[in-house]
Amino acid sequence: MTGLSSILASLSLGTSIVYFRGWQKLRVHSGGSIPLWRSICFPCGLLLIWLATNSTLARLDDELLTAHMVQHLLLMSVAPFLILWSRPKMPLLLGLPVGFVRSVVGPLSRTRLAHFISGLWGRLAFCWIVSIGVLIFWHVPFFFTAALNFEFWHLVEHSSFLAAGLLFWSPLVP
Protein backbone atom coordinates (compact mmCIF):
# COMPACT_ATOMS: atom_id res chain seq x y z
CA MET A 1 0.00 0.00 0.00
CA THR A 2 1.47 3.35 -1.01
CA GLY A 3 1.51 6.49 1.12
CA LEU A 4 -1.52 8.04 -0.56
CA SER A 5 -3.39 4.74 -0.44
CA SER A 6 -2.70 4.50 3.29
CA ILE A 7 -4.12 7.98 3.77
CA LEU A 8 -7.25 7.04 1.81
CA ALA A 9 -7.67 3.83 3.80
CA SER A 10 -7.36 5.79 7.05
CA LEU A 11 -9.93 8.35 5.85
CA SER A 12 -12.33 5.55 4.93
CA LEU A 13 -11.90 3.91 8.32
CA GLY A 14 -12.40 7.24 10.11
CA THR A 15 -15.50 8.02 8.04
CA SER A 16 -16.91 4.58 8.86
CA ILE A 17 -16.38 5.16 12.57
CA VAL A 18 -18.07 8.58 12.41
CA TYR A 19 -20.96 7.10 10.40
CA PHE A 20 -21.58 4.26 12.85
CA ARG A 21 -21.35 6.55 15.88
CA GLY A 22 -24.02 8.74 14.32
CA TRP A 23 -26.06 5.75 13.17
CA GLN A 24 -26.13 4.38 16.73
CA LYS A 25 -27.26 7.76 18.12
CA LEU A 26 -29.92 8.09 15.44
CA ARG A 27 -31.14 4.53 16.02
CA VAL A 28 -31.48 5.12 19.78
CA HIS A 29 -33.30 8.46 19.35
CA SER A 30 -35.60 7.30 16.56
CA GLY A 31 -36.68 4.10 18.27
CA GLY A 32 -34.95 1.73 15.86
CA SER A 33 -36.73 2.98 12.75
CA ILE A 34 -33.56 2.98 10.62
CA PRO A 35 -33.44 -0.15 8.47
CA LEU A 36 -30.32 -2.27 8.92
CA TRP A 37 -29.93 -2.68 5.15
CA ARG A 38 -29.53 1.08 4.81
CA SER A 39 -26.70 1.17 7.33
CA ILE A 40 -24.96 -1.70 5.53
CA CYS A 41 -24.94 0.21 2.23
CA PHE A 42 -22.51 2.83 3.56
CA PRO A 43 -19.62 0.51 4.53
CA CYS A 44 -20.25 -1.55 1.39
CA GLY A 45 -19.74 1.60 -0.69
CA LEU A 46 -16.53 2.39 1.19
CA LEU A 47 -15.36 -1.20 0.76
CA LEU A 48 -15.90 -0.96 -2.99
CA ILE A 49 -13.83 2.23 -3.07
CA TRP A 50 -11.06 0.42 -1.22
CA LEU A 51 -11.29 -2.56 -3.60
CA ALA A 52 -11.08 -0.25 -6.60
CA THR A 53 -8.05 1.62 -5.30
CA ASN A 54 -6.06 -0.79 -3.09
CA SER A 55 -6.76 -4.38 -4.07
CA THR A 56 -5.40 -6.58 -6.85
CA LEU A 57 -7.76 -4.73 -9.17
CA ALA A 58 -5.77 -1.52 -8.60
CA ARG A 59 -2.50 -3.28 -9.37
CA LEU A 60 -3.90 -4.61 -12.65
CA ASP A 61 -5.38 -1.34 -13.91
CA ASP A 62 -2.21 -0.43 -15.85
CA GLU A 63 -2.08 -3.83 -17.55
CA LEU A 64 -5.70 -4.76 -18.26
CA LEU A 65 -8.29 -2.48 -19.80
CA THR A 66 -10.98 -4.59 -18.12
CA ALA A 67 -9.54 -3.90 -14.66
CA HIS A 68 -9.24 -0.21 -15.50
CA MET A 69 -12.89 -0.02 -16.58
CA VAL A 70 -14.13 -2.01 -13.56
CA GLN A 71 -12.35 0.57 -11.39
CA HIS A 72 -14.20 3.36 -13.17
CA LEU A 73 -17.55 1.60 -12.77
CA LEU A 74 -16.99 0.99 -9.06
CA LEU A 75 -15.83 4.56 -8.39
CA MET A 76 -18.43 6.35 -10.52
CA SER A 77 -21.48 4.11 -10.37
CA VAL A 78 -21.69 1.42 -7.71
CA ALA A 79 -19.89 2.87 -4.65
CA PRO A 80 -21.48 6.36 -4.87
CA PHE A 81 -24.93 4.83 -5.32
CA LEU A 82 -24.52 2.65 -2.22
CA ILE A 83 -23.16 5.55 -0.17
CA LEU A 84 -26.03 7.84 -1.13
CA TRP A 85 -28.61 5.07 -0.72
CA SER A 86 -27.54 4.79 2.92
CA ARG A 87 -28.70 8.41 3.46
CA PRO A 88 -25.47 9.32 5.27
CA LYS A 89 -26.08 13.00 6.05
CA MET A 90 -27.66 12.65 9.51
CA PRO A 91 -25.49 9.74 10.73
CA LEU A 92 -22.33 11.57 9.66
CA LEU A 93 -23.42 14.82 11.32
CA LEU A 94 -24.45 13.05 14.53
CA GLY A 95 -21.21 11.04 14.54
CA LEU A 96 -19.01 14.14 14.52
CA PRO A 97 -18.12 15.85 17.80
CA VAL A 98 -20.82 18.38 18.76
CA GLY A 99 -18.29 21.20 19.14
CA PHE A 100 -16.98 20.62 15.61
CA VAL A 101 -20.50 20.64 14.16
CA ARG A 102 -21.37 23.86 16.01
CA SER A 103 -18.14 25.75 15.34
CA VAL A 104 -17.23 24.53 11.83
CA VAL A 105 -20.01 22.67 10.00
CA GLY A 106 -22.83 24.98 11.10
CA PRO A 107 -21.19 28.26 10.08
CA LEU A 108 -19.91 26.78 6.79
CA SER A 109 -23.36 25.44 5.89
CA ARG A 110 -24.87 28.91 6.28
CA THR A 111 -22.56 30.64 3.78
CA ARG A 112 -23.76 31.88 0.41
CA LEU A 113 -21.38 29.51 -1.33
CA ALA A 114 -22.88 26.53 0.52
CA HIS A 115 -26.40 27.58 -0.47
CA PHE A 116 -25.31 28.08 -4.09
CA ILE A 117 -23.64 24.64 -4.20
CA SER A 118 -26.63 22.91 -2.59
CA GLY A 119 -28.89 24.54 -5.17
CA LEU A 120 -26.80 23.12 -8.00
CA TRP A 121 -26.37 19.74 -6.30
CA GLY A 122 -30.02 18.83 -6.85
CA ARG A 123 -30.28 19.92 -10.49
CA LEU A 124 -30.27 16.84 -12.68
CA ALA A 125 -28.85 18.45 -15.83
CA PHE A 126 -26.00 20.14 -13.95
CA CYS A 127 -25.07 16.92 -12.13
CA TRP A 128 -25.03 14.86 -15.32
CA ILE A 129 -23.06 17.43 -17.33
CA VAL A 130 -20.38 17.73 -14.64
CA SER A 131 -20.14 13.93 -14.32
CA ILE A 132 -19.72 13.47 -18.05
CA GLY A 133 -17.23 16.35 -18.13
CA VAL A 134 -15.07 14.68 -15.48
CA LEU A 135 -15.03 11.42 -17.42
CA ILE A 136 -14.11 13.17 -20.68
CA PHE A 137 -11.44 15.31 -18.97
CA TRP A 138 -9.55 12.28 -17.64
CA HIS A 139 -9.61 10.59 -21.02
CA VAL A 140 -7.83 13.47 -22.75
CA PRO A 141 -4.42 11.86 -23.47
CA PHE A 142 -2.37 14.47 -21.57
CA PHE A 143 -4.38 14.07 -18.34
CA PHE A 144 -4.75 10.30 -18.76
CA THR A 145 -0.96 9.96 -19.08
CA ALA A 146 -0.39 12.17 -16.04
CA ALA A 147 -2.72 9.95 -13.99
CA LEU A 148 -0.86 6.84 -15.13
CA ASN A 149 2.62 8.24 -14.45
CA PHE A 150 2.15 10.14 -11.19
CA GLU A 151 0.52 8.69 -8.08
CA PHE A 152 -0.78 12.08 -6.97
CA TRP A 153 -2.66 12.65 -10.25
CA HIS A 154 -3.98 9.09 -10.13
CA LEU A 155 -5.41 9.86 -6.70
CA VAL A 156 -6.92 13.11 -8.01
CA GLU A 157 -8.43 11.16 -10.93
CA HIS A 158 -10.01 8.55 -8.66
CA SER A 159 -11.23 11.19 -6.21
CA SER A 160 -12.84 13.18 -9.01
CA PHE A 161 -14.48 10.01 -10.37
CA LEU A 162 -15.96 9.35 -6.93
CA ALA A 163 -17.09 12.97 -6.54
CA ALA A 164 -18.61 12.90 -10.03
CA GLY A 165 -20.41 9.67 -9.17
CA LEU A 166 -21.82 11.16 -5.98
CA LEU A 167 -22.93 14.21 -7.94
CA PHE A 168 -24.44 12.07 -10.71
CA TRP A 169 -26.53 9.95 -8.33
CA SER A 170 -27.50 12.69 -5.84
CA PRO A 171 -30.66 13.90 -7.63
CA LEU A 172 -31.73 10.32 -8.40
CA VAL A 173 -31.32 8.47 -5.10
CA PRO A 174 -34.24 9.09 -2.72
Each language-model region and where it sits:
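Alpha-helical membrane segments of multi-pass proteins
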Residues: 1-174
